[in-house]
């Protein structure tokens, strides 16, 4: 007979078996069903009785020697031998999910899900369940009603998706009942409050997708069955276990139907149906698969449990019955949250010290008596006593102090305050003031009642002769510092003094250190030379140069006649250091409204129009009216002769003047008229203010400079003006040429 898939609802019996009663509520609450009470005590099961090895692993109890090993309390009392492809302490890690042959009556096929332990069992006829471990029950022969829904949806596409065939519903059909096993752990999940996600668009019925539904996530410990509790309004549902992708997409592709067990008030998903990690389920109310209405989307997250010891029996309580086995979404395992006053990994120890019964900062030590013990011991700090260290010890109650001493009790004991003349921890001994030899440095001790007196040796003083006599207290050194030396002293004299008491002063002038008839004046630890006026230096050894400290500026020289130096200034400067420039313009040397420009050792006059000379004293006269009258009365032919003669004479004079000047004269220039001098010196026509230029002309004789030309030049005659209103030279005569 050919095999079939465990989740395919194609067989007419599967919809009946898949109808599940479910209460649609939320908020998981956990609880445990009580184990059946045996009539007689059962023998303690072995470490492998609970079948701890998964995925076909073989459990082997450890030997007694291994169990007595110091680390045995932290390790299981058994070992698992895992088949090929499976690893882990409990054979919980499956590299190939089909390597352990999880399908009892069918073939295993690895799922395309991203989870490494996902597989799909294709069951043989007559079996179903997650691992094809459940035989199909017999089919009832009566009580069936015809469904009003269509017989089948659209044709199944070639994607190997399971067919969704509407079942015939039978109200009286019941699921297999649940019979609790001894020691079986069950968590009850109620559906009073759930997160409703209405109308989630996941697809349509033709692609075997569904939409909407209640979205619930619940966490359970490993090896624990889940009881889904229902209320009066719940309906039987069809439950499918799907992959993570199918769960997100509300798709039944790669899913399989599961058959929970009917229990009083709900449905039970056995622990064999749940693998470590998330387990995703999609449930439908009655025949809602045909209508694509999801009634429930459930995620059961199975986590490893650390709530019972590894060597515990199947009927051992989680967290020793003194705590709650709980987890958080951020945690990977279930662990114990102990009740008040219980501690330990499994809440196995009653902590009698948790409430801090010991007083006065005493240390509490809990007696290791497991859960039934409530004994503890208080270790009191010094000074306290009592079962809870609540009382302070009075060490003076027995009056330990003698001879009238006062007893003072403290946390560390008692102290006796002795009367004068007694000593000891209890003031039991009489004081001998000289017994301890209080007098030092060979001093003699004398008893004086309860006191003593010391007679000191020479050189020592003080109540116990411990101090040297301070010989320097009377300041015996006149000009020095006193230093105690043993039983005497020594004077360290200041510079310039000597003697036993530093009372004598040295006279440094006895060596005649001053030169050149200087006077020596004795000082303390030194001398001073008073020099004559012309000498200086520490010993008056240097002759004074009066010009050494005088600085004459602007070319001035120092005259060192006598004891004083005097600056002889260059022309144009004055002052003690020749630092004052004489302003020659103060005397107004420029005539006829000429402008004076002060210069070092001189001045320059800028003359107005019609005046020339060093001081603008030469007047240039132009007689145009007289010449015009003479020319008018003169005959025309004579006029032409005169004009021609004058032109020839002018040209000859000009040639002679230029040649003479170019041969023998060098013209220097200064101030703002330098361009005019340069043109005249280079034998070019004059094109500048000649009146200002002529005032500064100098001449040279045979290449040597002479005095200013204004002292040698004769008056100048002008005959005509140029078009730009500047005169033309006709004759310049000089002396001594």
Curated annotation (Swiss-Prot):
- UniProt superkingdom: Eukaryota
Q: Does the keyword Signal apply?
A: yes
The record's keywords, sorted A to Z, are: Activator, Calcium, Cell membrane, Developmental protein, Differentiation, Disulfide bond, EGF-like domain, Glycoprotein, Membrane, Notch signaling pathway, Phosphoprotein, Receptor, Repeat, Signal, Transmembrane, Transmembrane helix
User: Region (Interaction with AP1G1 and somatodendritic targeting): which ranges?
Assistant: 677-680
* Residues recorded as bearing Phosphoserine in the entry: 685, 722
How is the protein altered post-translationally, as described in the entry?
N-glycosylated.
Q: In the UniProt record, which residues carry a glycan?
A: 204, 564
Reported effect of changing residue 677 to A?
Fails to be restricted to the somatodendritic compartment
Q: Which residues lie on this side of the membrane: Extracellular?
A: 26-640
Modified residues annotated as Phosphothreonine in this record: 714
Annotated positions of the Phosphotyrosine modification = 711, 721
Q: Name one GO biological process term.
A: glial cell differentiation
Tissue localization of expression is: Specifically expressed in brain neurons (at protein level).
- What name is this protein filed under? Delta and Notch-like epidermal growth factor-related receptor
Question: What is the role of this chain?
Answer: Mediates neuron-glia interaction during astrocytogenesis. May promote differentiation of Bergmann glia during cerebellar development by activating DELTEX-dependent NOTCH1 signaling.
Encoding gene per record: Dner
Kindly give the membrane topology term recorded for this protein.
Single-pass type I membrane protein
> May I have one GO cellular component term?
neuronal cell body
Q: Name one GO molecular function term.
A: calcium ion binding
Location of this chain's protein in the cell: Cell membrane
InterPro entries membership = DNER_C (IPR045769), EGF-like_Ca-bd_dom (IPR001881), EGF-like_dom (IPR000742), EGF-type_Asp/Asn_hydroxyl_site (IPR000152), EGF_Ca-bd_CS (IPR018097), Growth_fac_rcpt_cys_sf (IPR009030), Notch_Cell-Fate_Det (IPR051022)
Q: How does it assemble?
A: Interacts with AP1G1. Interacts with NOTCH1.
Q: Which residues lie on this side of the membrane: Cytoplasmic?
A: 662-737
Listed as disulfide-bonded, the cysteine pairs are 48-59, 53-80, 82-91, 98-108, 103-121, 123-132, 319-336, 338-347, 353-364, 358-378, 380-389, 396-407, 401-416, 418-427, 434-445, 439-454, 456-465, 472-482, 477-491, 493-502, 509-520, 514-529, 531-540, 547-558, 552-567, 569-578, 585-596, 590-605, 607-616
Q: What is its main location?
A: membrane
Spans through the membrane: 641-661
């Amino acid at each position: 007979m050919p095999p079939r898939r465990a989740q395919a609802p194609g067989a007419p019996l599967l919809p009946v078996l898949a109808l599940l009663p479910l209460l649609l509520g939320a908020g998981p609450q956990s609880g445990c069903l009580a184990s059946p009470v045996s009539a007689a005590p059962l023998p303690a099961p072995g470490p492998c009785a609970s079948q701890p090895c998964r995925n076909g692993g073989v459990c082997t109890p450890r030997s007694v020697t291994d169990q007595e090993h110091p680390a045995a309390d932290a390790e299981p009392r058994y070992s698992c031998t895992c088949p090929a492809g499976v690893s882990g302490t409990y054979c919980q890690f499956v590299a190939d999910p089909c390597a352990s042959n999880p399908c009892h009556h069918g073939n295993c096929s690895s799922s395309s899900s991203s989870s490494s332990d996902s597989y799909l069992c294709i069951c043989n006829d007559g079996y179903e369940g997650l691992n094809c471990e459940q035989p199909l029950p017999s089919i009832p022969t009566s009580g069936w009603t015809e469904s009003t829904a269509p017989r089948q949806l659209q044709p199944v596409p070639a994607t190997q998706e399971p067919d969704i065939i509407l079942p015939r519903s039978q109200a009286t059909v019941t699921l297999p009942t649940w019979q609790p096993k001894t020691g079986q752990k069950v968590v009850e999940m109620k559906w009073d409050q759930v997160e409703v996600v209405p109308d989630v668009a996941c697809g349509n019925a033709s692609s075997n997708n569904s939409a909407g539904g209640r979205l619930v996530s619940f966490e359970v410990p490993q090896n624990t069955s889940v009881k889904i509790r229902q209320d009066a309004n719940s309906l039987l549902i069809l439950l499918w276990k799907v992959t993570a992708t199918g769960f997100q997409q509300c798709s039944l592709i790669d899913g399989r139907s599961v058959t929970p067990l009917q229990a009083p008030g709900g449905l039970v998903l056995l622990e064999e149906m749940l693998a470590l990690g998330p387990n995703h389920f999609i449930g439908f109310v009655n025949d809602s698969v045909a209508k694509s209405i999801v009634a429930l989307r459930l995620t059961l997250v199975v986590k490893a449990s650390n709530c019972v010891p590894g060597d515990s029996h199947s009927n051992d309580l989680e967290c020793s019955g003194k705590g709650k086995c709980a987890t958080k979404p951020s945690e990977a395992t279930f662990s114990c949250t102990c009740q008040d006053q219980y501690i330990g990994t499994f809440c196995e120890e009653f902590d009698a010290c948790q409430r801090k019964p010991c007083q006065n900062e005493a240390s509490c030590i809990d007696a290791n008596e497991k859960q039934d013990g409530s004994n503890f011991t208080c270790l009191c700090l010094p000074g306290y006593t009592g079962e809870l260290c609540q009382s302070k010890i009075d060490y003076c109650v027995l009056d330990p102090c003698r001879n009238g001493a006062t007893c003072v009790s403290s946390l560390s004991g008692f102290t006796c305050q002795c009367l004068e003349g007694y000593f000891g921890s209890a003031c039991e001994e009489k004081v001998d003031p000289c017994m301890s030899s209080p007098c030092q440095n060979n001093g003699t001790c004398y008893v004086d009642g309860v006191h003593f007196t010391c007679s000191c040796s020479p050189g020592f003083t003080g109540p116990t002769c411990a101090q040297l006599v301070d010989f320097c207290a009377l300041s015996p050194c006149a000009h020095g510092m006193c230093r105690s030396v043993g039983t005497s002293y020594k004077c360290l004299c200041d510079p310039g003094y000597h003697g036993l008491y530093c009372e004598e002063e040295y006279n440094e002038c006895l060596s005649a250190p001053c030169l050149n008839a200087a006077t020596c004046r004795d000082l303390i630890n030194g001398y001073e030379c008073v020099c004559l006026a012309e000498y200086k230096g520490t010993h008056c050894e240097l002759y004074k140069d009066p010009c050494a400290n005088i600085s004459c500026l602007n070319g001035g020289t120092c005259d060192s006649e006598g004891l004083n130096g005097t600056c002889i200034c260059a022309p144009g400067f004055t002052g003690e250091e020749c630092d004052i420039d004489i302003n020659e313009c103060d005397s107004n040397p420029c005539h006829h409204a000429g402008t004076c420009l002060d210069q070092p050792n001189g001045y320059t006059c800028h003359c107005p129009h019609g005046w020339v000379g060093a001081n603008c004293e030469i007047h240039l006269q132009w007689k145009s009216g007289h010449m015009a009258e003479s020319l008018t009365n003169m005959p025309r032919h004579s006029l032409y002769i005169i004009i021609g003669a004058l032109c020839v004479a002018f040209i000859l004079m000009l040639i002679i003047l230029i040649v003479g000047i170019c041969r023998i004269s060098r013209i220097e220039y200064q101030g703002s008229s330098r361009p005019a001098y340069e043109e005249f010196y280079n034998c070019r026509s004059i094109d500048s203010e000649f009146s200002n230029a002529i005032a500064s002309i100098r001449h040279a004789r045979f290449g040597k400079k002479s005095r200013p030309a204004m002292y040698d030049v004769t008056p100048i005659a002008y005959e005509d003006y140029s078009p730009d209103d500047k005169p033309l030279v006709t004759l310049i005569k000089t002396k001594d040429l």
